Structures are given as C-alpha cells and as structure tokens.
Amino acid sequence: MVRRVLAFVDRPCERFEEAAAFWTAVTGTRLSPRRGDDGEFATLLPESGDAWVKIQAVGDGGGAHLDLEVGDVRAAVARAEALGAAVAADHGDWAVLRSREGRAFCLVSGEVPGEVPGEVSVGGTTSARRPPVFAGTRLDQVCLDIAPGAYEEEVAFWAALTGWSPRPGSLPEFTVLAAPGMPVRILLQRLGEGPGRSAHVDLACADPEAARALHERHGAAFVARGRRWIVMRDPAGGIYCLTERDPET
C-alpha cells in the first residue's frame, strides 16, 4: 500500500545551490540539511504540513521523479515487477525501478528522521496535511510525459501501482491520479511526439501571470504558453509549469 507519494526535483550537481535557493523562495519553505553519501538529497520544509517535496543533485540532465513510500518495500518491489516494472538498483530498504515505459522511480520505506509528516486523523483514517498555499500557488503535482505509443499501458501501470483510480484531465491528453489526503497528485500527459520518459513538477496557481512575475523575480525564465498553463525554466535549467488551477482544492 502506498502511504505517501514524494516529488523529487532533480537538478545537476553543479546547479544544486541555485535550484535549492529558487525552490525554497517560490514555495515559502526552508531547506533541510543535505544528506546522502554525496550530500545529494535535501527536503523543502514547509511551515506546517507534510514535507513531501525533495530536491536531488543528479549527474546530468534534470527533471523530476516520484518516490512511493510503502509499508513493505520487498512486497512493493514484487508487486511492481508483477505489473511490468524492472529493478534498476536494489538497496534493501529502498529500490530504484523503471516503469514499463522505462521511467525511473523509487520505492522507499519511510520518512527521514526529523522530517515526520504532519498527520491528522479523519474518520479514523490517517492522512497527510497539505502544506499551506504560498503567494497564491501550491506545488502539488508531478507530470509524467509519456510517448504516444506507451500512454495507455503507462496509465494502467501507475493506476495499479498506486491503487488510485484514474480520471480524465482537463484535456483529452491528460489523465489524473489522485487520492484523498495526499498532498500530491500525478498527471499523466500523452505527448504528441517524442520519446517520453521525462517528468516535471507543476504548481497550481490562482493567478498564473502573477506567479510568473514572482518566479521571474527569483530568476526563472518564460518558455512557452499552453492552453491553461505557462511553461517556465528555473535558474538551474529545469522545466516546470504554472497551471491554471485552484491551489486551495
């Protein structure tokens, strides 16, 4: 069973400090102490709620990936393999896998000490508290960019792996996976062309243009305008989107 979904902002090692400064500024968070063998991991810590957004220094490229926090990593790995995933690296209490399309994700066992999520009991069920809206925005979504020929299979894989029911998005090329009490949702996007296997984070914005102005003041750059979103590039070169959605819902 998936207990939490964690969003990782992946940025090149040499741009980590720039990326961390930007993302803490535009989300109203502070950076945790760095951890990992090479100090490659850190968490964006909100004033309240569940710390579910992480940042990772990577060797090249960038983008985003998902970590699924589960109660039993061994059982979760076996289930993922049965659904068609392949293990890329097994570290015992956590593992790196690839989806049927070849998209990397991790299965992990629990929280980092000192970063226990805020939780509330609703009707006897434990659920995570969402971090507060900051400057009219909330980072609440990871978008998986999927090649046209792999789309249906990838949607089925992620729905089965998370146990979340898919529902149509705002446009025909979108499918949403979300669950009550989870601070993050997954958006699966069918690309018009291209290899897929990429991912980026999205922010829900009450006013995307106001959010764009704020982000540009912190060093981001405008890339393109979509039907209901603005594509941006952060100071470390990573792509993300400001989407026209209510950050309170």
PLM regions with names:
Residues T27-A64, A104-E111, W164-A199, P235, ...:
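Conserved short beta-strand elements that form part of the metal-binding/catalytic scaffold
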Residues L45, V87, G92, P132-F134, ...:
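Generic marker of residues within folded, mature protein domains
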Residues T24-V26, V70, A85, P113-G114, ...:
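General N-terminal targeting signals
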Residues M1-A51, A75-A76, A82, A88, ...:
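Core segments of cupin and vicinal oxygen chelate
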Residues M1-A20, A64-L66, V108-A156, L161, ...:
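N-terminal beta-strand motif that seeds the catalytic metal site of vicinal oxygen chelate
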